[in-house]
Amino acid sequence: MPRSLKKGPFIDLHLLKKVEVAVEKNDRKPVKTWSRRSMILPQMVGLTIAVHNGRQHVPVLVNEDMVGHKLGEFAGTRTYRGHVADKKAKR
């Protein structure tokens, strides 16, 4: 269920401050964050945000289509290696 419009988007304050500093300085280095729950705002477009997936930081280049989504949607936490092949079926 989506968040109520009267509440507005959620973003952690520490991430918002990092984004504002990066925009001010025109910094191209990735902004490192553990906040997967924060929503992508229009001022983040063009920035690279390194989102933690539980093991490492995954670089996510934010574009206009991502606005309104959560950061965690773009950094998967599970690795799918496929189903194990049956040895009898190979013969």
Swiss-Prot record:
Belongs to the universal ribosomal protein uS19 family. One of its GO terms (cellular component) is cytoplasm. InterPro entries: Ribosomal_uS19, Ribosomal_uS19_bac-type, Ribosomal_uS19_CS, Ribosomal_uS19_SF. GO terms for molecular function: rRNA binding; structural constituent of ribosome. It comes from the Bacteria. Keywords: Ribonucleoprotein, Ribosomal protein, RNA-binding, rRNA-binding. It comes from Pseudomonas putida (strain ATCC 47054 / DSM 6125 / CFBP 8728 / NCIMB 11950 / KT2440). This is Small ribosomal subunit protein uS19. The keyword Ribonucleoprotein applies. NCBIfam families: rpsS_bact. It holds the Pfam family Ribosomal_S19. PROSITE patterns: RIBOSOMAL_S19. Protein S19 forms a complex with S13 that binds strongly to the 16S ribosomal RNA. One of its GO terms (biological process) is ribosomal small subunit assembly.
